């Protein structure tokens, strides 16, 4: 696992302060780190978010994307019966996890495998924003 220190980029990145603020705000959300998640760089233009959602059925999960905000919600069905635990180490609470997406990041799909929710993202750069070669006369 790699951890990246982005602080040196603050000095040399002009106009990207909003991006860094989004990253910091995402880390400081008041949800206590539940559920835990990973963000993986698959390749230059593809990302994958993996969220640990053990105990949630596919029908109890909701994923929405609007503008640059990805929201993942998990809500257990109301029909769960009361249980008496001697020890409860597995969290069964409902959750809402928000991810601020950078511009041109699109959600391509999601699947639930062995208690992990995978959300695939792709960076799509419009033709107008791609670098173009300028001829010198």
UniProtKB/Swiss-Prot annotation:
Its main location: cytoplasm. Residues 28-137 form the sHSP domain. InterPro entries: A-crystallin/Hsp20_dom, ACD_IbpA/B, HSP20-like_chaperone, HSP20_IbpA. The lineage of its organism: Bacteria, Pseudomonadati, Pseudomonadota, Gammaproteobacteria, Enterobacterales. Induction: By heat shock. PROSITE patterns: SHSP (PS01031). One of its GO terms (cellular component) is cytoplasm. SUPFAM superfamilies: HSP20-like chaperones (SSF49764). One of its GO terms (molecular function) is mRNA 5'-UTR binding. Associates with aggregated proteins, together with IbpB, to stabilize and protect them from irreversible denaturation and extensive proteolysis during heat shock and oxidative stress. Aggregated proteins bound to the IbpAB complex are more efficiently refolded and reactivated by the ATP-dependent chaperone systems ClpB and DnaK/DnaJ/GrpE. Its activity is ATP-independent. It comes from the Bacteria. The keyword Repeat does not apply. This is Small heat shock protein IbpA. Keywords: Chaperone, Cytoplasm, Stress response. The keyword RNA-binding does not apply. GO terms for biological process: negative regulation of translation; protein stabilization; response to heat. Belongs to the small heat shock protein (HSP20) family. It is found in: Cytoplasm. Monomer. Forms homomultimers of about 100-150 subunits at optimal growth temperatures. Conformation changes to monomers at high temperatures or high ionic concentrations.
């Amino acid at each position: 696992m790699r951890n990246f220190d982005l602080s040196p980029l603050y000095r040399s990145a002009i106009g990207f302060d909003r991006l860094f603020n989004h990253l910091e705000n995402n880390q400081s959300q008041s949800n206590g780190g539940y559920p835990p998640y990973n963000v993986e760089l698959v390749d230059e233009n593809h990302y994958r978010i993996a969220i640990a959602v053990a105990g949630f059925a596919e029908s109890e999960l909701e994923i929405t994307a609007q503008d640059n905000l990805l929201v993942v919600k998990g809500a257990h069905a109301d029909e769960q019966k009361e249980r008496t635990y001697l020890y409860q180490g597995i969290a069964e609470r409902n959750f809402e996890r928000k991810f601020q997406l950078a511009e041109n990041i699109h959600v391509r799909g999601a699947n639930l495998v062995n208690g992990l929710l995978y959300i695939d993202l792709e960076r799509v750069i419009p033709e107008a924003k791609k670098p173009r070669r300028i001829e010198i006369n």
